[in-house]
Protein backbone atom coordinates (compact mmCIF):
# COMPACT_ATOMS: atom_id res chain seq x y z
CA UNK A 1 0.00 0.00 0.00
CA UNK A 2 1.23 3.44 -0.92
CA UNK A 3 1.04 5.95 1.89
CA UNK A 4 1.40 9.63 1.25
CA UNK A 5 2.38 11.52 4.35
CA UNK A 6 1.36 15.14 4.34
CA UNK A 7 2.72 16.65 7.54
CA UNK A 8 1.19 19.81 8.90
CA UNK A 9 2.86 22.93 7.52
CA UNK A 10 5.26 24.53 9.95
CA UNK A 11 5.45 28.31 10.20
CA UNK A 12 8.96 29.62 10.63
CA UNK A 13 9.81 33.24 11.31
CA UNK A 14 13.15 34.86 10.60
CA UNK A 15 14.53 38.38 10.69
CA UNK A 16 15.94 40.11 7.62
CA UNK A 17 19.67 39.35 7.39
CA UNK A 18 19.14 36.81 10.21
CA UNK A 19 19.07 33.03 9.96
CA UNK A 20 16.71 30.08 10.41
CA UNK A 21 17.20 26.37 10.96
CA UNK A 22 14.50 23.75 10.53
CA UNK A 23 14.19 19.99 10.26
CA UNK A 24 12.63 17.89 7.53
CA UNK A 25 11.45 14.35 8.27
CA UNK A 26 10.79 11.80 5.55
CA UNK A 27 9.70 8.16 5.78
CA UNK A 28 12.24 5.48 6.66
CA UNK A 29 11.92 4.04 3.12
CA UNK A 30 13.58 7.25 1.86
CA UNK A 31 16.77 6.62 3.85
CA UNK A 32 18.96 6.03 0.79
CA UNK A 33 17.19 8.35 -1.64
CA UNK A 34 18.46 11.84 -2.55
CA UNK A 35 16.78 14.55 -0.44
CA UNK A 36 15.81 18.04 -1.54
CA UNK A 37 14.25 21.28 -0.36
CA UNK A 38 12.27 23.21 -2.94
CA UNK A 39 10.51 26.59 -2.92
CA UNK A 40 6.94 26.60 -4.16
CA UNK A 41 6.25 29.20 -6.87
CA UNK A 42 2.75 30.16 -8.03
CA UNK A 43 1.38 27.23 -6.05
CA UNK A 44 2.57 24.84 -8.77
CA UNK A 45 6.25 24.56 -9.62
CA UNK A 46 8.66 23.75 -6.84
CA UNK A 47 12.18 24.98 -7.57
CA UNK A 48 15.01 23.07 -5.91
CA UNK A 49 16.84 25.28 -3.42
CA UNK A 50 19.30 22.59 -2.33
CA UNK A 51 19.64 18.83 -2.55
CA UNK A 52 21.96 16.09 -1.34
CA UNK A 53 23.39 15.63 -4.85
CA UNK A 54 25.21 18.97 -4.63
CA UNK A 55 22.71 21.24 -6.36
CA UNK A 56 22.17 24.72 -4.92
CA UNK A 57 20.02 27.50 -6.28
CA UNK A 58 22.10 30.54 -7.21
CA UNK A 59 20.04 32.81 -4.95
CA UNK A 60 20.99 30.67 -1.96
CA UNK A 61 24.65 30.09 -2.83
CA UNK A 62 26.80 30.59 0.27
CA UNK A 63 23.72 31.04 2.48
CA UNK A 64 22.28 27.54 2.81
CA UNK A 65 23.40 24.29 4.40
CA UNK A 66 21.66 20.91 4.30
CA UNK A 67 22.76 18.45 6.97
CA UNK A 68 21.61 14.82 6.65
CA UNK A 69 20.61 13.18 9.93
CA UNK A 70 19.55 9.65 10.79
CA UNK A 71 16.17 8.11 9.92
CA UNK A 72 15.63 10.06 6.70
CA UNK A 73 15.68 13.38 8.57
CA UNK A 74 17.72 16.37 7.51
CA UNK A 75 18.12 19.91 8.75
CA UNK A 76 18.35 23.07 6.69
CA UNK A 77 20.11 26.24 7.81
CA UNK A 78 19.63 29.48 5.84
CA UNK A 79 21.57 32.63 6.69
CA UNK A 80 21.46 36.20 5.40
CA UNK A 81 17.68 36.04 5.05
CA UNK A 82 16.17 38.18 2.30
CA UNK A 83 12.62 39.32 1.67
CA UNK A 84 12.53 37.03 -1.39
CA UNK A 85 13.17 34.00 0.83
CA UNK A 86 9.65 34.27 2.28
CA UNK A 87 7.22 31.68 0.99
CA UNK A 88 6.33 28.01 1.00
CA UNK A 89 8.98 25.30 0.93
CA UNK A 90 8.62 21.54 0.57
CA UNK A 91 10.97 18.80 1.76
CA UNK A 92 11.16 15.68 -0.34
CA UNK A 93 13.17 12.77 -1.68
CA UNK A 94 13.60 11.40 -5.17
CA UNK A 95 16.48 9.53 -6.84
CA UNK A 96 17.00 12.54 -9.14
CA UNK A 97 17.07 14.97 -6.19
CA UNK A 98 14.22 16.90 -7.84
CA UNK A 99 10.49 17.04 -7.17
CA UNK A 100 8.36 15.07 -9.61
CA UNK A 101 4.75 15.69 -10.63
CA UNK A 102 2.26 13.30 -9.10
UniProtKB/Swiss-Prot annotation:
Modifications the protein undergoes after translation, according to the UniProt entry: N-glycosylated. N-glycosylation is required for anchoring IgA molecules to mucus, but is not necessary for Ig binding.
GO cellular component: extracellular region; plasma membrane
Origin: domain of life: Eukaryota
Keyword terms, alphabetized: Cell membrane, Immunoglobulin domain, Membrane, Repeat, Secreted, Transmembrane
Signal peptide: none
Membrane topology: Single-pass type I membrane protein
Compartments in which it is found: Cell membrane; Secreted
Assembly notes: Interacts (mainly via CDR1-like domain) with dimeric IgA. Interacts (mainly via CDR2-like domain) with pentameric IgM. Either free or part of the secretory IgA (sIgA) complex that consists of two, four or five IgA monomers, and two additional non-Ig polypeptides, namely the JCHAIN and the secretory component (the proteolytic product of PIGR). Free secretory component interacts with bacterial antigens toxA of C.difficile and eaeA of E.coli.
Physiological role: Mediates selective transcytosis of polymeric IgA and IgM across mucosal epithelial cells. Binds polymeric IgA and IgM at the basolateral surface of epithelial cells. The complex is then transported across the cell to be secreted at the apical surface. During this process, a cleavage occurs that separates the extracellular (known as the secretory component) from the transmembrane segment. Through its N-linked glycans ensures anchoring of secretory IgA (sIgA) molecules to mucus lining the epithelial surface to neutralize extracellular pathogens.
Protein name (Swiss-Prot/TrEMBL): Polymeric immunoglobulin receptor
Gene name of the encoded protein: PIGR
Amino acid sequence: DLQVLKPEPELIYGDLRGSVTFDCALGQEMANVAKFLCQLKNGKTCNVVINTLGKKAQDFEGRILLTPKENSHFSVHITGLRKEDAGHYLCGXHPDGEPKEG
